[in-house]
């Protein structure tokens, strides 16, 4: 990963991004003594999600099915699936549900969680993935933990990872993830 770190300027409250001509002001949140992140929340932003889905769908033509994790990836994967005319997409849940039959489980520790979480898919979804080209979709990739867990689920279900896409990469660039923009991490000079 190639890191993208900007110096934090005392008193700075926002970071502005522009993706596909749409500008958004993101609040800077302190996450440690010397580190701030620009908080990105796309839930409810139909205009932004629709525009990003248009661009990301171009990268996923040729996939048979898409997978994401709950919950912020759901509106994005829904829009992309609509554009690609996919009849179904898979959502990995963040905990086992009583209705799941023979669930597949992969553990990860996203940057927004204090403890490891389990990403799970119902075993009844395996036929939708097995022997298929699967596009992995996320709104933002920070530590790559969630994306890696989704990859594991695809492989466990017998699918092939087609491509991995995200609206934003945070703090660095991963060569195997296609994206629309980068969010830097902000560090205070010591």
Question: Where are the regions that the model predicts?
Answer:
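Short Gly/Thr/Asp-enriched flexible loops that form oxyanion-binding sites at enzyme active sites
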Residues: 75-84, 151
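PRPP-dependent phosphoribosyltransferase catalytic core
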Residues: 2-10, 148-190
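Conserved acidic residues
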Residues: 64, 132, 162
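Gly/Ser/Thr-rich loops at beta-strand to alpha-helix junctions
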Residues: 70-76, 142-143
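A short helix->loop->beta-strand "cap" motif at the edges of active sites that frequently abuts
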Residues: 85-87, 159
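Short glycine-rich phosphate-binding loop at a beta-alpha junction
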Residues: 63-70
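Short, glycine/charge-rich flexible loops or terminal/linker lids adjacent to PRPP-binding catalytic cores
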Residues: 87-134
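Active-site-facing substrate-recognition patch
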Residues: 1-62
């Amino acid at each position: 990963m190639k890191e993208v770190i900007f110096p934090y300027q005392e008193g700075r409250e926002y970071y502005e991004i522009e993706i596909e001509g749409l500008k958004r002001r993101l609040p800077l949140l302190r996450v440690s003594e010397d580190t701030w992140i620009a908080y990105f929340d796309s839930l409810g932003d139909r205009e932004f999600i629709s525009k990003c889905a248009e661009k990301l769908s171009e990268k996923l033509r040729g996939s048979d099915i898409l997978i994401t994790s709950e919950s912020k990836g759901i509106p994005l994967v829904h829009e992309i699936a609509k554009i690609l005319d996919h009849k179904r997409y898979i959502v990995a849940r963040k905990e086992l549900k009583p209705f799941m039959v023979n669930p597949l489980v992969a553990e990860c520790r996203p940057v927004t969680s204090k403890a490891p979480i389990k990403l799970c898919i119902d075993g009844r979804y395996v036929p939708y993935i097995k022997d298929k080209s699967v596009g992995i979709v996320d709104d933002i990739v920070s530590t790559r933990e969630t994306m890696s867990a989704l990859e594991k689920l695809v492989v466990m279900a017998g699918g092939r990872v087609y491509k991995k896409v995200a609206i934003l990469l945070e703090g660095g660039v991963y060569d195997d993830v296609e994206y629309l923009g980068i969010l830097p991490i902000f560090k205070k000079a010591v």
